[in-house]
């Protein structure tokens, strides 16, 4: 797979707390230059990105319940509605990890389903669900993937990039085994090189979340 082909898999990401308008403009310019799938930014910058990227195929993604997943369901619902109204094409939401660990699968399902239902009220909106694989056992990863599928989301995503570790090849293989072709997988966290990205794609990822997109597609 060429670097130009890999670029189509990349969500070009800048989720740092110190992001400025200049940083976001640069992010968008890079996404346009390299034809990345999307830019992924904090909600404050959704409108800005939508304006920068108008009339381009680059999508605008943002986050909900990020990075801990521990905000209330009502808060996540509000964040999702606001994001879509501001022009977001895609949402990366974090599940309530504690609820999953306690076995409260109904709550986790309901939370995701609410966001999915909001997305379906618009045209061509995507919901990706972050399960934070570094916090889960293999059995919990399997359970989380099944909940995400049942709730009707478009993607299950490995990581926020803010936890103990990010995407692992073995996790992508496991997740692909569970979800098959029913939903897609996004790998994120610690993907910094062309080799890292290619490994995740070969394992079954359809999208790569990284702040190293330019380095990945520009390596000699």
From Swiss-Prot:
Reaction catalyzed: 2-deoxy-D-ribose 5-phosphate = D-glyceraldehyde 3-phosphate + acetaldehyde
Known role: Catalyzes a reversible aldol reaction between acetaldehyde and D-glyceraldehyde 3-phosphate to generate 2-deoxy-D-ribose 5-phosphate.
Keywords of this entry: Cytoplasm, Lyase, Schiff base
Pathway per the UniProt entry: Carbohydrate degradation; 2-deoxy-D-ribose 1-phosphate degradation; D-glyceraldehyde 3-phosphate and acetaldehyde from 2-deoxy-alpha-D-ribose 1-phosphate: step 2/2
GO BP annotations listed: 2-deoxyribose 1-phosphate catabolic process; carbohydrate catabolic process; deoxyribonucleotide catabolic process
GO MF entries: deoxyribose-phosphate aldolase activity
Native organism taxonomy: Bacteria, Bacillati, Bacillota, Bacillota incertae sedis, Caldicellulosiruptorales
Protein name as annotated: Deoxyribose-phosphate aldolase
Compartments, as annotated in UniProt: Cytoplasm
Documented EC number(s): 4.1.2.4
SUPFAM superfamilies: Aldolase
Species this protein is from: Caldicellulosiruptor saccharolyticus (strain ATCC 43494 / DSM 8903 / Tp8T 6331)
Family per similarity comment: Belongs to the DeoC/FbaB aldolase family. DeoC type 1 subfamily.
Chief site of localization: cytoplasm
Family annotation (InterPro entries): Aldolase_TIM (IPR013785), DeoC (IPR011343), DeoC/FbaB/LacD_aldolase (IPR002915), DeoC_typeI (IPR028581)
Listed GO CC annotations: cytoplasm
CDD domains per UniProt: DeoC
Active site as annotated: 92, 157, 186
